[in-house]
Each structure stands twice: as structure tokens, then as C-alpha cells.
Amino acid sequence: MITQREISQVAHREQMSDRVIEKDYVLTWLLLGLASSPLREHLAFKGGTALKKIYFPDYRYSEDLDFTVVGTIEPDTILSIVDETLRRLATGEGFQFEMPTGRIERRTDSLTVYVSFVGPLQARLGSRDVKVDFTLNERLVFPVVDKPVFSTYGDRIDREIGSYTLEEILTEKLCAVIGRTEPRDVYDLHFLMGRSEIDFPQIPAAFAKKAKSKNVDPARLGEALGRPGLSRMWETRLVHQVKELPHLEQVLRELKRKLKEHGLLELQA
């Protein structure tokens, strides 16, 4: 485990709080730990954290880990391997971890665990935690790809993990924007729509397939971008994750133009 001094140095350089950097550091080691565990072959890393840890190391900071479970594995087996991983990281890297049974959420389509930790800032165990979410029975449109995990910290190790493609992350974000009011989804979608690495001709059909599997109406995308809750939560939800947060109005204007350009605002269910 790195020192509190290194956390503070990174926080100063990144213009973020020490707590944000500490959580990012802990998330990184949890990801590396799972990438070194028997669970690796059953995981597809996804979401905003995958954008930062797999594709774009300078991207916004995140607060949780999101995976889709592939293949056949029981939830109890997942929990057992996560617990073993936490014990191994505690012994090898000096963390303290706790996975309270009362903070394990089981649903038909997901398994969520909250992991309390003591990291370099040495806060009391139970005062800080990270969420690790496992989605079950998810339909993937694109193949899972093995990618190296980015870590900019001094004690990094080299590991790969199965991850969503950028195209898969984009189609999930399109559905997420329709299904919930969460500013980070809009921020991520705006970012992804501007990336030349993405094979955009594949996206309309992939979006339609993903939306059908999630029982989401793709025709509601434009309506979803106009929800008043976005403006109320834009700054409070994102200011601690983004160095220079753009104005929501600018983001929405550019995003709608790009969505229209790629034929994503005219899709019908």
C-alpha cells in the first residue's frame, strides 16, 4: 500500500480531494485483485470506471466497480471469491477490508456488495466503502475483450481483465440515460459520442438490440435528455469527479447534434 503522502501528491496534481484519490486507489487494487482471482474468467468490466481504468486513464473519477457476469457461476461462489480476494489483498498489500453480510444486496438480475476499507488515509473501518456490482443475465451485443488495467500508482502490477468494448459501453449508456436520471450517464455518453475509436455504423442496431433486452424504448432518448433533474444534479454529482466540468447546456447541445448525426434520435422500439 502506498503512503498518505503519495495520495496527497496525486490529489494535488489531479486537483482532487485526498478522499477521491484514496477511493480510486482502493478501486484499482480491488480490480487488480479480482483480475488475479478465479472470478476473472466470469467477469466483463464495464461502466464509467472501465472507461478510466481500461481505456482513458485521464478520464473522470468513479466511485464503484461494475461487472457483468458471463458464463455459469452461483452468487454464493462470487461472494466467496470476493471474500478470498479481500483477504489476499489485506495480507499482501496492507489494506483492511470488511464485507458486512447486512450490506449484500441480492436481486434476480444483480448482486451488489459494499466493501468497507482502511486505506492510506487510515480512516476508521466502516466509515468509507466502495460498491461492487455484478449484473446477472445481461445480454451482450459485442464480444468481451481482454484489456490491461491502468494504474498510475507506485505499487502497480500488470494484470488484464475481460472488459466491455467501447461500443458495448456506449450502447449501455444510451439505455441508462433513458432508464434513469443520472448526470454521469449523460457526461459519459457525451464523451463517448466524440471518440473516433468507436465504430459508429454498428451502434444503431446494437442500441436497438440492447434496448429490447432491457425493455427500454429507444425513441425516448431525446425526451430523457430534457429531464429537469439533470440540471439540478449536474454539478453536485460530478464536481468531485471531473477537473473541469463543462456546462450542462453545452454538453446537451453537442450531444444531441452527435446523436442525430449518427441516427440515434430517430430509432423506434
Language-model features, listed with the residues they occupy:
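Structured mid-to-C-terminal alpha-helical surface segments
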Residues: 1-43, 53-65, 69-269
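Glycine-rich beta-strand-to-loop/alpha-helix junction loops that act as flexible
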Residues: 45-49
